Regions:
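Short acidic-hydrophobic, aromatic-tinged amphipathic segments that line or gate anion-handling sites
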Residues: 112, 184-193
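Short amphipathic alpha-helix with an adjacent loop that forms part of the alpha/beta core around
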Residues: 195-203
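Alpha-helical substrate-recognition element adjacent to the catalytic core
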Residues: 2-115, 119-120
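Substrate-recognition "cap/lid" segment bordering the active-site pocket of phosphatases
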Residues: 97-149, 180
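Acidic, Mg2+-coordinating phosphoryl-transfer loop and its flanking beta/alpha structural elements
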Residues: 88-93, 147-188
């Protein structure tokens, strides 16, 4: 796998969905919506930002919840095993202000993500994407310098990355996404995902 890079989504693949956990903490069901439910990321984020403002919730409120979260069971061991075999880059639509506690618990893997915009009191006023469709463009850029790319994710916002990669694999996606993209193989356990990655590396 020396000429391969594995690109992984973060939330739902290695860590819990941050917005779902925050929604449960503050008891606002609308904040439970994720890219597994709404395919348009801008629509989703503007909805989230509006709900935060309506309820007087700030970035520190979200960060407090994140500090109490751990990676998904088995995620750190899976990531360690994968990094022994090849290079791994996490491509995520999360934000730098959310990521640090989880990156520390995962052993500081390489992460490409986005940034939240806040005012002086921590109110979230907007967000800044690294670039539009950044996951797909990162895969294309890595391919252009001679790497074969294997990608794994679970949501609508991962599909373009999975289709662009030399091999794309779903990990624990909802049934709606499986039905919509039946050509993408599905894995449910980290052992399955690791095997699927190893098998893909032989064939690409």
């Amino acid at each position: 796998m020396s000429l391969s890079i594995v690109c992984l989504d973060l939330e739902g693949v290695l860590i819990p969905e941050i917005w779902i956990n925050f929604a449960e903490s503050v008891k606002i069901d609308e904040l439970k919506l994720t890219t597994r439910d709404i395919s348009d990321y801008d629509v989703l984020m503007n909805k989230r930002i509006g709900i935060l403002k309506e309820n007087g919730l700030t970035l520190p409120d979200i960060q407090q919840v994140i500090e109490g979260l751990d990676p998904l069971p088995g995620a750190k061991e899976f990531l360690d095993a994968l990094r022994e075999r090849t290079q791994v880059i996490i491509l995520s639509d999360t934000f730098t202000q959310f990521a640090s506690p989880m990156m520390r618990k995962l052993g500081w893997p390489t992460l490409f993500c986005n940034t939240l915009e806040t005012d002086a009191d921590g109110t979230v006023t907007g967000y800044r994407l690294r670039q539009q469709d950044g996951k797909k463009k990162a895969v294309k850029a890595l391919s252009s310098i001679g790497f074969s790319i294997i990608a794994a994710g679970d949501s609508y916002n991962d599909v373009s990355m999975l289709k662009t990669a030399d091999a794309g694999i779903f990990f624990r996606p909802p049934d709606t996404i499986i039905d919509e993209f039946p050509q993408i193989p599905v894995t449910r356990e980290y052992s399955e995902l690791l095997t699927a990655i190893e098998e893909a590396a032989v064939t690409i």
